[in-house]
Structures are given as C-alpha cells and as structure tokens.
Amino acid sequence: MSQTQVHSHDALSDHAFEDGVPYEYFDAARREDPVRWIEEEDGPGYWSVTRYADVVAVTRNFQQFSSETGGTTREDIGHEDLLARQTLIDTDPPLHTAMRRVLSPRFTPGNVHKEWVGFVEELVQKTLDQAFSRPGFDWVADVAAVIPMIVLGELLGVPTEDRAYLKALGDEMIAGADPDHAPRTADSPENVKENSGYPFSSPAGRDIWKYADALRDRRDGNLGHDVFSLLMTGNLNGRKLTTRELDNFFSLLVVAGNETTRMALSHGLLAFAQNPDQFRRLKEDPSLLNTAVEEVLRWATPIHHFRRTALVDTTIGETAIKAGDKVIIWYASANRDETVFDAPYTFDISRKPNPHVAFGGGGPHICLGNSLARLELQIVFRELAKRVETIEIDGQVHRLRSNLTHGIKELPVRLTYA
C-alpha cells in the first residue's frame, strides 16, 4: 500500500474556489498523491480522490462506498438528521432503485424529447429575444437563470408567481459560504450545524420543505400531469410517499433541475467567449452541436465533488481505506485528467470520445435529469450560434464561493448579432 501524506483542507475550502477551480492543486494531486488524506478542523478528516479512474470506481461501487451512510456532503451529520433530509442522491440500492423508479419513466430520452422539445424551443426563443434587445446584459440573470427555472416550474407545476422565490431558495441552499446567496449561513459553522436536519444544512432547505407542504395542500384533489402530482400519487415499494419523502424529492429537484443546468449554461457561454475559434466552428458546422454540449458539460462540471463513506476495509488504487472513512470524489479533477482527456485544458467542441463525469461516473447515481439538461443546452447553444456573431465578456465575472457547486453569479457580456 502507498504511504499517504497528510494535507490541510484549506486548499479545498469554499474560499479556495472563489477565484476559480484550483486546477493546479488537482493536477499535482493526481500526479503525486491521487488518494490523499485531508485533515479537517471540523471533522475526522477524509480521503480526497482526484484521479478519473478512482473517481469512477468509487462512484460505481455502492457496495463498498455508500451514499446513504454519511450522506453525500462533506460535513458530518447525525443519523436522525440524515434520515430526515434523505433524498435520492443520499440513498443506496435497493432503496435508491425504488425511489428512482417513482420518477424515471418521465425522464427517459424519448419521453423528454416528446414532452419538452417544443416548449423549450419556444422558451429559448422568447428569452433570447428579450436579452438580445440590447447589446450588453448579464448572461446569468437574463438567460442562464431564466430558462432552467421556467422549465423546472413547468415540470413541477409551480405557479409562475412562486418561481422567483423558489429560485432564491435554491440559490441559498447550495451556495456554501457565499455571502451574496447564503447570508444566513455564510462563514457561520454554528448556523450550518443548527440546520443540519435540512437539505444541504441550510435554512433554505427548511423553507423549501414548507413551500412543498403548502403546494401539496393546494394541489390535493387538483392533480395534473406534472411531476409534483406524480410524487403525490407515486408508488414507493407499494405505498405512497410520506410527507418528508415528498419534501425531499421536491428540494432535490429544485437544485438538480435548475441550479446545475444554469451553471452549465453559464460556463458554456464563458468558454465560447474565451475560445472564439470554437464558437466560429459551431456556427459553421451545426453538426458539432452534440459534441459541443458534451464538451461544455466536461468544461463546466457543475458539481465539484460528492462524498461517499467506506462500508468495509478496502482500497482505492494502492491506498488502504478503513471502514467508516469519509471519501470525497472530485469530479472537477477527474474531468481534467490528462490520462483520459487529450489536452484537458483545451476547450474542443469536437472532442470524441468524451467520457466526462459531469453527470456522475456511471452506476446507479447517474443524473436522473441528464436528458432534459442536455436538451436545454442543445437548444440554447444552437440558437446562440444562429443568432450571434461574436461574444465578449464585458466586465468582471463573479463566481460562487463554494467547493461543492461551480456557480457563476454574474457574467456581463456584449454580443454582436447576425
């Protein structure tokens, strides 16, 4: 077994990501110590897994590395709190399989295409028309945050007037230590601990639960074809979902159906602005759209990491792992692994193959909504290539202070139109 040095969590803290992903750190870690022990001031420490092959192996091996035991976020949560906030991503098979089955028929590629192509195309046209009425605007506020939130609202059957409120709660729930989006918990470990029973240890998680309860009361007896109605009537191992299970499904969808797609749209636009040759290629050859979207997903990697907990004594690579050890798998590092991706720091819209882990590394936890996210990205960037000649960044790019999610808060742009 390899001898592993001890490292500080400081290099991987929320603050370390505020100016961008610390790729140099990850590059060195993959070369020198791909499974390294990180000390925590607020916990027992964890194994930091940075190499693509190891990230994929851990992600797929739920028999040895659990999402249910310990949850999927770095902080250590008590057992009762974990059960209270348990979502689809915080379970292992067979419970995970049963929970996923409640919604999976609605998210197959065929059903997504049939139900959503027309709606998303019309929405994208309308949103771009409004944004493109002026040469300069904030891509995040005016496009990237608008489209996924409206899609999510339609998906869940959330009234139009409530969607901005849900967006704000979703922003806060996953904002980590960012003072703009999470003022109630930013740089306040005490507040995080006080809210550990709510999704992402955030008071916004509590507020989303309350909203879901109120929506359920309003919808009782007035169900439709939306996913919230499906949750209210869904079958989980022969029974209906409990109130808390429904609340947790709802909170997860608010994040997974909105925040991560917004991040990919934001980083994709930034990548095209910084690589005008690739934008020109897409304009000249629309057949590159699908590979372009996959490269945007690799480039963006909306979720930096997730946690697993070792269930047995085992190994990752050549490193011995003990039962009960916390393991952090870094998708942000895996998607820049030079042993898998040629020229990983080159944004190449024709990259093929492109086995990125933006939706997870395979196995039972592959992102349920990946087909809908891809559809939104494809339509936005297809229309962008048709309607825009050049993209320039027109001010400072403000990033989210978070080591969990790869968010951009503001992206001022100036476009010239075709």
Q: Where are the regions that the model predicts?
A:
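Cytochrome P450
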Residues: 1-418
